[in-house]
Amino acid sequence: MTVRNSSRPIARVFRATVAPGCRDELLRKFHSSSAALVNSKKGCLKYRILEPVDASALEVVFESVWQDLHAVKEAFGDGWEQSYLPEGYSVLMTACSVHHFLVSENSTTK
């Protein structure tokens, strides 16, 4: 992978396919442990938890926005390109992924 080392903000998008019957528990963990984890790291600007409009859909998203790529690497270490799963998360999902995006300079927070 060719990584652009940029000073622009980085969105870290964690997507999970929820295991049957585990959606509420995974969302609780997002609101507690995932939120606490990113809030404890230097360089995290904000986070948000996204649920699908379709209540029967099995995907949920935890998105965090970081000051820059250096902040992401500092927070997650050598495994920054991989999903970080705290204890107890893996049994709540059948699949997950993490992707990183440069935040557009024209993005707004309205």
Task: Give each language-model segment a name.
Residues K29-S32, D78:
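Residues within well-ordered alpha-helical secondary structure of globular protein domains
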Residues T17-F30:
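Short, surface-exposed ligand-recognition loops at beta-strand->loop->(often short) alpha-helix junctions
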Residues D24, H70-V72, N106:
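Residue-level signal for secondary-structure boundary sites
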Residues M1-I10, R48-E59, Y84-K110:
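Glycine-rich beta-strand-turn "strand-cap" elements at beta-sheet edges
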Residues N5, A36-C44, V65-H100:
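An amphipathic, aromatic/His-enriched active-site/gating alpha helix that lines ligand/cofactor pockets
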Residues I10-T17, R48-G79:
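Short, well-ordered beta-strand segments in beta-rich or mixed alpha/beta enzyme
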Residues H31-N39, E51-A57:
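Short, charged helix-to-loop "capping" segments that act as catalytic/coupling loops
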